Amino acid sequence: MRPPRCVGRTQGIPLGLLAFWVATARCLQSQGVSLYIPRSAINATVQEDILLSVDYICHGVPTIEWEYTPNWGVQKIVEWKPGTPANVSQSHRDRVCTFDNGSIQLFSVGVRDSGYYVITVTEHPGSSQSGTILLHVSEIRYEDLHFVAVFFALLAAVAVVLISLMWVCNQCAYKFQRKRRYKLRESTTEEIEMKDVEC
């Protein structure tokens, strides 16, 4: 017995769709390197450790290179292939850590580290992708901390003066009440004596 035949439906993948998928896969393979930078601008303060985070996709083992572009020119920071030791420039030795995904971490940044950081991921000659991250490093404002310290010292001085004035007022009120009680006792005893004399 034959299985029933479905009219209008085809089973399996149509040949045209399969050809489209193969063509798309080949186009994607020929593109080479894809680079993703989640944060293109980073603000930091002095002495902070900063992660310049990136991620890439490629088919082979790429060469990753980071360059620093301050106001006066271009300076190479590091170059490496994932899984191999990094070639770190003398200016950033002991200040940079590399990761296999292409990210780098800068330790103890200073204002001089502000600028553009350019990453270039190269799979083979002619197949590369570049991206840029802007790093702005600012100093901690000690003048602001000084102002806050002076303000709190002034508040403490005002509090001490107010507490002292309250203590003086309390002592004056206590003396005034004592004096009033003493006068009241004197007048009461005087009245009692006068009543005794009149009797």
Curated annotation (Swiss-Prot):
| Region of interest (Important for CDC42-dependent filopodia induction), ranges | 169-185
What kind of modification does the protein receive after translation? N-glycosylated.
InterPro entries, alphabetized: CD2/SLAM_rcpt, Ig-like_dom_sf, Ig-like_fold, NK_rcpt_2B4_Ig_dom
Q: What protein name applies here?
A: V-set and transmembrane domain-containing protein 5
Q: Which residues form the Ig-like C2-type domain?
A: 36-138
Assembly, in brief, is: Can homooligomerize through cis interactions within the same cell membrane.
Q: Which GO terms describe its cellular component?
A: axon; dendrite; membrane; plasma membrane
Subcellular locations according to the entry = Cell membrane; Cell projection, Dendrite; Cell projection, Axon
Q: Which residues form the signal peptide?
A: 1-27
Which residues span the membrane?
147-167
Which keywords, in A-to-Z order, does the entry hold?
Answer: Cell membrane, Cell projection, Developmental protein, Glycoprotein, Membrane, Signal, Transmembrane, Transmembrane helix
